[in-house]
A protein has these predicted regions:
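Active-site microenvironment of metallo-dependent hydrolases
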Residues: 1-24, 29, 332-427
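Divalent metal-coordination and catalytic microenvironments
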Residues: 12, 26, 31, 46, ...
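Active-site gating loops and adjacent loop-to-helix segments of metal-dependent hydrolytic enzymes
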Residues: 64-96, 130, 134-140, 208-235, ...
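Alpha-helical scaffold segments that flank or form the walls of functional sites
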Residues: 66-131, 153-164, 417, 423-427
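Metal-coordinating catalytic core of metallo-dependent amide/deamination hydrolases
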Residues: 122-242
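Catalytic core of soluble alpha/beta enzymes
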Residues: 206-230, 234-236, 241-254, 267-278, ...
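His/Asp/Glu-enriched, well-ordered alpha-helical/loop segment
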Residues: 228-235, 277-362, 378-380
Length: 427
């Protein structure tokens, strides 16, 4: 992201590193935080600035099929509702869905996403709206004989994007899952990754059926099987992990594979509950993701934080499980770490100026007695008034020429493009 000049956000509350809150001013120069000037708060404040949220597992183009096939378990949902529609999607359709999904995320304070979908041009949708993205195309891992295409395509894409986006839209390594790829592909991609240094994005142990069928095929869990191919040697981030064992968690901690928790999607599809508190005990980095808008059915990371907090307290019969700060870090710095980034995810001098700015003046946010608790248990994406990516206000409710960068009509055009694609797909 490229920006010029100096910006100041004054008289704001902040979520700071070290699980601290503070009050004062944030100074942005270029694309980074240049200074944080703290001082005592002497009067009420209605502005909170927090790190931009990091959505670590998403399928943004699935805004095209939001809510389709509700009430079906995962395999039937995929085979009966989703795959038949996806088979008809054009690159134009996928681009429209990507742009709309990216805009939804920016409007809710998400500044960076790890997104998985197919289509050669789909990553451009994130670039178009000014959002950071780690993208990957799983389809190449499903069709036999496409390993070289996968490797060369990823290399050429990243070389091109270094110039166009300063590397902020970057392609990671990917397989859809253990059950939709083969050992030869995994070993080949592992060899390539030792040179390319890319992290692996994949689905893992989402359902009991998936987990047990892998054991029946290989005598190993999905994590153990994949680790044996070498494909996890460069680290990565595994979505779901609902049925992972303690031994799986130990492998993940050892190989620097983050667990991306998707509580809403897992509940909607009846998949179960990932044991994230146990994973954390065993040293796994736990991040947060929405999954796609067809299985969530929105991309609101505040809602994801709230649900993640509540379900694990209820399951454990223990209100001390997962503090608000634990949850906030899953949605910010843990997500950045999962993606291999140390320049985002925190409000600190020298970090990229990726900011989520929230209005605290809504009835459900007053009084603001405990800011971390308020963030996790009271806030919604709709409370976000501005989102800053690399120093640029990519979303700003107060902007006279339209909320999104690009002026009046930007959102209307994106909506029209999405609905035209939906009609073409016969939905």
């Amino acid at each position: 992201m490229k920006t010029d000049g100096r910006k100041e956000i004054r008289d704001c509350l902040m979520l700071l590193p070290g699980r601290r809150t503070g009050f004062g001013d944030i100074v942005v120069e270029g694309d980074s935080i240049a200074d944080i000037r703290l001082r005592p708060q002497t009067e009420p404040c209605t502005t909170l600035v927090m790190p931009g949220l990091v959505n670590c597992h998403c399928h943004a183009p699935m805004t095209l099929v939001r809510g389709l096939g509700g009430g079906l378990p995962l395999q039937r949902w995929l085979e009966e509702a989703i795959f038949p529609v996806e088979a008809k999607m054009t690159d134009e359709d996928i681009h429209a869905g990507t742009v709309w999904g990216a805009m939804e995320m920016l409007a809710g304070g998400t500044t960076c996403v790890a997104d998985m979908y197919n289509g050669k041009t789909y990553p451009h949708g994130f670039l178009e709206v000014g959002m950071r993205a780690r993208v990957c195309i799983p389809g190449l891992s499903i069709v036999p004989g496409r390993l070289e295409e996968c490797i060369s395509g990823t290399r050429s894409w990243n070389e091109r994007m270094r110039g166009e986006s300063n590397g902020d839209v970057y392609m990671d390594a990917c397989i859809h899952s253990e059950y939709l790829t083969d050992e030869k592909f995994c070993r080949g991609l592992a060899d390539a990754n030792r040179e390319l240094g890319r992290r692996l994005h994949f689905h893992c142990s989402e359902t009991k059926r998936e987990h047990e069928e892998c054991i029946a095929r290989h005598g190993k869990t999905p994590i153990a099987y994949l680790a044996g191919t070498g494909i996890l040697d460069r680290g990565g981030y595994a979505a779901h992990c609902v049925w992972c064992t303690d031994d799986d968690f130990r492998i993940m901690a050892e190989r620097d594979v983050a667990l991306v928790h998707n509580p809403t999607s897992n509940m909607k599809l009846g998949s179960g509950f990932a044991r994230i508190a146990r994973a954390m005990e065993l040293g796994v980095n736990v991040a947060l993701g929405t999954d796609g808008p067809a299985s969530n059915d929105n991309l609101d990371m505040f809602e994801e934080m709230h649900i993640a907090s509540l379900i694990h307290k209820g399951l454990a019969n223990d209100p001390t499980v997962l503090s608000p700060w634990d949850i906030i870090e899953m949605a910010t710095k843990n997500g950045a770490k999962a993606l291999g980034r140390d320049d985002i995810g925190e409000l600190a001098v020298g970090k990229k100026a990726d900011l989520c700015i929230v209005d605290l003046d809504s009835p459900h946010l007053v009084p603001a007695l405990d800011i971390p608790n308020l963030v996790v248990n009271s806030m919604h994406g709709s409370d976000v008034v501005a989102t800053v990516v690399g120093g640029d206000f990519t979303y700003d409710k107060s902007r006279a020429d339209g909320e999104f960068a690009g002026g009046h009509g930007r959102m209307e055009k994106a909506k029209a493009d999405l609905l035209a694609a939906v009609r073409r797909l016969g939905l």
